Amino acid sequence: VTLKVGASPSPHAEILEAAAPILAEQGIELDIVEFDDYVLPNTALADGSLDANYFQHQPYLTNFNAENGTDLVSAGSIHYEPLGLYAGKTASLDELADGAVIGIPADATNGGRALLLLQDLGVLTLKDGIDLDYFRNAEDITFSEYDGIAENPHNVQIEALEAANLPAALPDLDFAVINGNYAIPAGIADKLLATEDAAGDAAQVFANIVAVRAGDETRPEIEALVEVLKSDEVKSFIEEKYEGSVLPVA
């Protein structure tokens, strides 16, 4: 049996490559098709060109189905790309100076995740009731004028930038909170100071999934694919290769 699976080049296709030999032992051959965009893997799955894809999280898939009238579902959650706090001009949080500048992603969801991480790390405190759902449901937030911070003892300055531009800006910032998928190709794993908790809300909501056409999630070979991707062998591969910028789902 051959399974044709669409995937983003990193880390998804690399994780599938690690799973391929284990699946081959079960008589399942993986044909991995790499995509550089986030629309074609779903349209190709919907039209039957692919058996599955592996590149997105559930909120993105839910939104895609709603906008395109497709009926694609998750067959399982595999990994999570945590937001991490990376050292720029300042080497560690112990050296956090008054007025330090911290870069965060400009979009509401990821910027919100960044502020929640900074709260977990004791850098600042958000107003009561501000949680992940609050940021996910927010239309647009201008973080430069954001008034949801209750306590900011070090008077840190929050600088919101396009998520993809944060790694390049890191040398000019004291710290930055960066998405795993941008941190990996930037080669900044050695500057990682802390990440979101793998058992926390964001990890559950934004876990990357294997998606299939509705009804296919019970196909034996799809079940085998998900089982292998969640196996100890593949989990170890993820932990060793990505050094914390990609984590297996807890």
Label the predicted regions.
Residues 1-10, 28-34, 101-102:
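Short, well-ordered beta-strand elements
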Residues 32-43, 131-168:
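Short helix-initiation/N-cap motifs at beta->coil->alpha
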Residues 38-69, 85, 186-188:
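Pocket-flanking alpha-helical
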Residues 46-56, 100, 123, 153-157, ...:
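Alpha-to-beta junction loops
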Residues 63-75, 90-91, 172, 177, ...:
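Ligand-binding "clamshell"
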Residues 75-125, 235:
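A conserved helix-loop-strand patch within extracytoplasmic ligand-binding domains
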Residues 82-94, 206-221:
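A bilobed periplasmic-binding-protein/Venus flytrap-type ligand-binding module shared by bacterial periplasmic
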Residues 110-119, 221, 229-249:
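Periplasmic-binding protein-like
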